[in-house]
Amino acid sequence: MCWQSIEATKQVAKRDFYVYKIGFVIGNNFSSLYQKYSYKIKRSNPIIPLKPVRKYPYDLAKIETGYHSYKEVAIGFYPKNPYFRNIYLGDVITGYIDKFECYSALYVGTFIVPKGSEYYINTRGEIVSSNIIYTGKWVKL
């Protein structure tokens, strides 16, 4: 997963705030869907410096490193087909829709970006932060 944005304004968390990731729950751990990083409940992770990069001045700013997550996640259910769901990731209003069909093994995990962490957020509600903590809370898709 690569964070991208026209603007890359670094922010520092004034307080803890919640974010969400898609992945797998394995025992007491959460494994992210894209990078397969394993998070332990309520354990601090290594702080990762965030470096926005633009190949050319007119390119989107991109950040590969850091902890990638979403500001919001909403799930649309269809009673006539319980194996089909629309997952609204990022910003429910301006974010994007990801369709997960028959992915009953996936979970939405709740995480905290701790106070003092650096982070960037784009217009799609995607967040990349220098630190993240898994709360141990999840919802099965």
Regions found by a protein language model. Name each.
Residues 1-65, 73-141:
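Conserved NAD+-utilizing ADP-ribose enzyme module
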